Amino acid sequence: MSDIAPVTNTPYIPPTPEVGLPLWLLAELTYRCPLQCPYCSNPLDFAKQGQELTTEQWFKVMQEAREMGAAQIGFSGGEPLVRQDLAELIAEARRLGFYTNLITSGIGLTKEKIIAFKEAGLDHIQISFQASDEQVNNMLAGSKKAFAQKLEMAKAVKKHGYPMVLNFVTHRHNIDRIDKIIELCLALEADFVELATCQFYGWAHLNRLGLLPTKDQLVRAEAVTNEYRVRLEAENHPCKLIFVTPDYYEERPKACMNGWGNIFLTVTPDGTALPCHGARQMPIQFPNVRDYSMQHIWYDSFGFNRFRGYDWMPEPCRSCDEKEKDFGGCRCQAFMLTGDAANADPVCSKSYHHGIITQARDESETATQTIEELAFRNDRNSRLIAKSS
């Protein structure tokens, strides 16, 4: 007999062309984190956010989301390992029938926890690294012991039968060593490697001048990655390399989250529900799971309906024949760079604000900011930012 809980309580509301199902639930369990990565996507003012949801409140979120059709859950943060109830949350997600992911720095992970999470039903662990070099990794992480811990836990994850999934955020300070990064991943017997060039939200946006690679750096890094792909394929090697470029070097925007409020739903540590993890910065009052059901949040709330469909679009998006491909791009990026979330994403060459992007590219060619000069993500800096805003 199956131990998966039936999904029957909530009346089924079929998806429409403008409102899909919330298939992917990101559970940001906490903003607490032992590391200080200067490219973290968490809000700059995370230190002033409210009290974290309780175990029971997360159970309710997962139950309601599953009843609506959510299929996959990612436990993230901050660092989700600081939550003492993580194994309980994993077990409940498994009982409900979710495919479960743990997105972690590996700091705080132990062999005992890896076993406990396996017993609870965890499907997938993704461990992030800052660099292939111990000194650079630890400098970016703000921890002298981070690299050694990550190596040990990556090996333990592999040993206990999880898919080996590694994530490296690349930027101007580590991208030139992408060959060393790939070699480290192969040595760790990684199954999947995400070489994700920094996306400029949260702390990464604050530090953009010191993080954005040059065009030449990106071209070289992608060429090296492709050389490894060819070699691995020829050897019938199982490792898959995923290279993610920053939109700052594109001429068309990404179809962010496959459309606003279409398949992706984030719940933040204090219960605020968002259509993407960067949306909290917008001047929109988003609903909280303490006050509303997930069904109301997804289908009826103003925040989730604000940029659905196409009627909200101004020019040049409104008359663009590509709007059904990219949905006008990223609303958060439009807000950060132009002050109006309804504007076309400035990444698009048709945007009236595309000059902001070309200027950023130009600035990357002459940037001299060192790692030590970056603003690191920590409570002190967050409180200073919150106080000044």
Curated annotation (Swiss-Prot):
Q: What does this protein do?
A: Catalyzes the cross-linking of a glutamate residue and a tyrosine residue in the PqqA protein as part of the biosynthesis of pyrroloquinoline quinone (PQQ).
Q: Which organism is it from?
A: Pseudomonas savastanoi pv. phaseolicola (strain 1448A / Race 6) (Pseudomonas syringae pv. phaseolicola (strain 1448A / Race 6))
Family, as annotated: Belongs to the radical SAM superfamily. PqqE family.
Q: Which residues bind [4Fe-4S] cluster?
A: C33, C37, C40
Q: Which PANTHER family match?
A: PQQA PEPTIDE CYCLASE, RADICAL SAM DOMAIN PROTEIN
Q: Which cysteine pairs are joined by S-S bonds?
A: none
Name the needed cofactors: [4Fe-4S] cluster
The pathway where this protein functions is:
Cofactor biosynthesis; pyrroloquinoline quinone biosynthesis
Is Metal-binding found in the keyword set? yes
Which HAMAP family does the entry mention? PqqE (MF_00660)
- PROSITE patterns named in the record: MOAA_NIFB_PQQE, RADICAL_SAM
- Record protein name field: PqqA peptide cyclase
Relay the cofactor remark from the entry. Binds 1 [4Fe-4S] cluster. The cluster is coordinated with 3 cysteines and an exchangeable S-adenosyl-L-methionine.
EC number in record: 1.21.98.4
